Structures are given as structure tokens and as C-alpha cells.
Amino acid sequence: VNNCDAPNCRIKYGDNIRALVTYLNVVQCIPFKRIAELISDLCGQKISEGTVQNILKENSTKADAAYEEIRKRIECAPVVGADETGAAVGKELHWNWIFQNDLLTYVYQMKSRGQQAIDSKFPNGLPNSTLVTDRHRSYFNMNVKDHQVCLAHLLRNAEYLNELDTKQDWSRRFIHLIAHAIDLRRAGDITKRKIKVLKTKMKNLLGESLTHLDEEFESFKKGILKVKDYLFTFLTDLHVPYENN
């Protein structure tokens, strides 16, 4: 066995190590410190967190053209789903923003959860798109063709109200209306008359007084009233899904 000292020069990591670092961070969402530990344990190669960061920056730059092309295609897509989720960056809370269609997903991270985070990537909004989202206010400030509220989110909210007060039936009737709309779509049994009946029943339900119930019921109802025009878009445009999952 021959041993020698490492050469006194700048170390350059090979393509395999660089690809592995990028995969572990971008696909597996592993933080810098753990990536450095994994590379050391699996490959016997010491690597610093700073080097991990530099590799990711370099590979990110190489992907800029493709990344921008994805953004442009999302920007002109007829239907787009969007969501945002918190992400710990060091000791700070950042937000991962996701805009996607059936073929492409565009992801970016910002400190802000507000309108400026959206405008930084889509300053003109999505004027050709029906946007499928939760009820986060920033989405409804965007310039879009139309909206569809994610019904999966609403069903979870209503199920919580069921558990909060098992004696009332308001939230159960809300769930029944939403579930019936979904069943119509799945069965392909949609008519203008049935849509009109659904909307009338929802209007009547949202018009009921809930002051005798827990304040969370009234809060939920007020939130639904703000987006009531976007509950059943998926029944008139069959390209639009009823959830953004």
C-alpha cells in the first residue's frame, strides 16, 4: 500500500459527487450538514457545508434556462394548481411556493408568504389560467382567468367542525353538498339545472345564522362567503379539478 500526502492545491469534486449532492438536497430535501455527513460516511470523502452550498449554486445556474422555461409554460397554462408550505431555513421560517399543471411543477422559496412572493415570479399573474388553490388571500389578488377553491381543504375544515360540535348538522349539510357536486363530476352527470340547484342550496346554507354555535362556525362561513363564486367552477369547465393535491 502506497500512501502520500494530499496535493497542496484546490480540490475539485467529480460529477458523481456533485450529482449526488444535488439529488440529496433537491429531491430528498436533506439539509447541508446531513449531506456532508452522508458523503463522508458513504464515500469516505470529506466535504464541507460550504462546498455543498457552492455545488448547489453552480448546478442551479446550469439549470436556469430550463427553470425559466418551466415558469413560462406554467404562466400560459389553461389550468394551474398552486400551494405554499412552510420550510425551516436555519432558524427562520421560509415558504416553498408550488405552481403546477399536469406536466410541469415550478417550485421556489421565499421568506414572504404574501403577494410579493407571487409577484416576484408571476408579475402579470396568470391571465390565461384557472387557478386551483386553498383560500389563502394572496391567490385571489392575482390576475387570473378564473378560480377554483380546493374542495379537499374545505372538506377537512368541515370535518373538524363536525368533531367540534357533534349535535349540529350545518357542517354535515355543507359536506353533503360538496360531496354531491364531486359525485356529479365523477359520474359525468352534470346539467345546468343541477348546477343551479346546487348553487341555490349552498346560498341558502351560507345564509343561515350560526350565532348559536361555536364562533369557529361563523368564521368558516364568512371565509366561504368570500370565495362562494369559485366553489363549483369544476362543474362548468371539465379541465379544472376540484382539488389542488
Regions from the language model: what does each represent?
Residues 1-245:
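Catalytic center-proximal scaffold of phosphoryl-transfer enzymes
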